[in-house]
């Protein structure tokens, strides 16, 4: 009887808390690390300079906990420029961006000259996010976020974000790009899904197209780029938005197809980013964050 009453109480709580919707069984692991820190450390010539660098890193680590808390997360570890945290899906990107901005601001005085390019290297923070199922063994989830961070750190120039989406069925996809590019593009894609301006099926048809073309980059495709771009435009144009009740607007078709036509991203990248954005949009909607993010 006690168990039955507890289950009823839990059901009632979930109905109120989630407005009758089922809570999303996924959460985000965040792992972040400073870029080019070895070079920056080596450039400090005096004891005082090393002390000041250590002080700045310690200051950033102390700021990590309130930042993660602000975005409804839980800090697991913060030491120097390393951060590991748990976050809900609808705040993870914003939290990672706040951490990256804070790190860049705190470390701004430690710009160094790259001897190979003769250009200034500004301290930056790259982050990996892993969207994982709550029943997935933690060891697997930690490995996923480590690989996401590694992906971000492999991006030229770094100052990057990478997101790995791992589905319970075993499928996994990773997207990555620099701050100010990938995060802004995802924000636009999320808006499209929240406003029902694009069909989820379009993203999966683009993925099928990429697989058919047997490559993730334009150099691997066996069709002319113009033909690929035309097929992307055709797929986007014939898929209905708003749950099949209206056509996808010409502006949306143009904005998405232009990304491929201008070779900013490949067909596979566009498909993967749309699929990840769709998952994030579901979390935003459930959290009631459609209008303010």
Residue spans of the language-model regions?
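Charged, helix-rich terminal subdomains or tails
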Residues: 1-81, 85-293
């Amino acid at each position: 009887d006690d168990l039955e009453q507890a289950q009823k109480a839990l059901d009632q709580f979930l109905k109120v808390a989630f407005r009758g919707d089922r809570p999303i069984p996924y959460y985000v692991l965040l792992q972040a690390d400073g870029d080019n820190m070895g070079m920056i450390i080596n450039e400090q010539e005096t004891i005082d300079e090393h002390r000041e660098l250590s002080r700045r890193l310690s200051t950033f680590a102390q700021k990590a906990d309130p930042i993660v808390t602000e975005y409804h997360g839980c800090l697991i570890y913060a030491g120097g420029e390393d951060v590991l945290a748990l976050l809900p899906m609808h705040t993870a990107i914003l939290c990672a961006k706040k951490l990256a901005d804070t790190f860049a601001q705190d470390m701004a005085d430690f710009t160094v000259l790259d001897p190979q390019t003769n250009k200034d290297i500004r301290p930056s923070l790259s982050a990996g996010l892993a969207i994982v199922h709550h029943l997935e063994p933690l060891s697997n989830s930690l490995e996923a976020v480590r690989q996401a961070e590694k992906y971000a750190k492999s991006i030229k120039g770094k100052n990057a974000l990478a997101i790995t989406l791992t589905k319970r069925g075993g499928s996994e996809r990773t997207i990555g790009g620099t701050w100010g590019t990938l995060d802004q593009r995802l924000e636009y894609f999320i808006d499209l899904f929240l406003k029902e301006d694009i069909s989820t099926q379009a993203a999966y048809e683009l993925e099928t197209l990429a697989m058919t073309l047997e490559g993730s980059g334009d150099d691997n495709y066996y069709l002319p780029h113009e033909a690929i771009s035309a097929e992307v435009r055709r797929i986007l144009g014939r898929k209905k938005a708003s749950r099949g009740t209206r056509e996808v607007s010409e502006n949306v078709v143009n904005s998405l197809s232009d990304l491929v036509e201008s070779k900013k991203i490949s067909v596979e990248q566009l498909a993967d980013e749309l699929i990840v954005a769709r998952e994030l949009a579901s979390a935003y909607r459930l959290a009631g964050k459609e209008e303010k993010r």
